């Protein structure tokens, strides 16, 4: 582990020093407490979920890259946040959404979470619903193509929408899907992007 989450590992630094300087820094600690702890109800128990080291630093870097990518000089490409299986991707997505929604530079963005299967859409939507308090708003699942278009077109700011890739298929006779908005702060999060995204 390193103090700032970078790959520049300093072997001469004591582990305790890394923890104190890297986690008990006022800005980092407050950030962690605000955006990286969630609570889930499991039967009759309340379970606390906390982001791990890789999630905390990964989400912070992803938010920073998103701010740059959506700025006037940005290219609109926020990047890829890759996880191995079972390493907390869904919770990282929740933390990213929570932090991004509250980031002043993003001007109350709209998030569109895209999956390539209905079961994944339902599963991820449920994870976000469980963490509604952390997100400070209720996620919405689009029912169909027209529903998604209406929701995005009528939403000037904010909102977390779930949909599947199939809803972006062009209408019969069209070669491209129509532009839904010219806003710079609509962020698309593609789950399992390696299966359906390219370019």
Q: Can you say where each PLM-predicted feature lies in the sequence?
A:
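ATP-dependent helicase/translocase motor core
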Residues: 1-110, 119, 123-134, 156, ...
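Short beta-strand-centered segment that lines the nucleotide-binding/catalytic pocket of NTP-utilizing
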Residues: 113-115
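Conserved motor-coupling elements within RecA-like helicase/translocase cores
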Residues: 143-161, 179-180
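Conserved RecA-like ASCE ATPase "motif II neighborhood" in helicase/translocase motors
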Residues: 158-192, 196-199
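Acidic/polar loop patches that form or flank catalytic/metal-binding clefts of enzymes
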Residues: 135-141, 195-196
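Conserved helicase motor
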Residues: 118, 140-150, 165-170
């Amino acid at each position: 582990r390193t103090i700032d989450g970078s790959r520049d590992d300093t072997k001469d630094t004591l582990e305790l020093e890394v923890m104190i300087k890297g986690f008990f820094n006022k800005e980092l600690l407050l950030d962690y407490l605000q955006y990286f702890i969630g609570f889930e109800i499991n039967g009759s128990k309340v379970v606390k979920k906390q982001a791990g080291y890789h999630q905390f630093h990964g989400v912070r870097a992803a938010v920073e890259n998103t701010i740059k990518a959506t700025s006037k000089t940005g290219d609109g490409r926020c990047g890829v946040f890759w996880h191995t299986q079972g390493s907390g991707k869904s919770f990282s997505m929740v933390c990213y959404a929570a932090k991004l929604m509250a980031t002043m530079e993003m001007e109350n963005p709209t998030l569109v979470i895209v999956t390539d299967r209905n079961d994944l859409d339902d599963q991820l939507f449920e994870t976000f619903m469980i963490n509604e308090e952390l997100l400070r708003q209720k996620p919405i699942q689009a029912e169909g193509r027209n529903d998604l278009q209406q929701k995005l077109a009528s939403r000037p700011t904010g909102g977390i929408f779930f949909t599947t890739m199939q809803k972006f298929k062009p209408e019969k006779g069209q070669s491209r899907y129509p532009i839904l908005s010219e806003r710079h702060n609509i962020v698309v999060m593609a789950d399992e992007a390696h299966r359906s995204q390219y370019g």
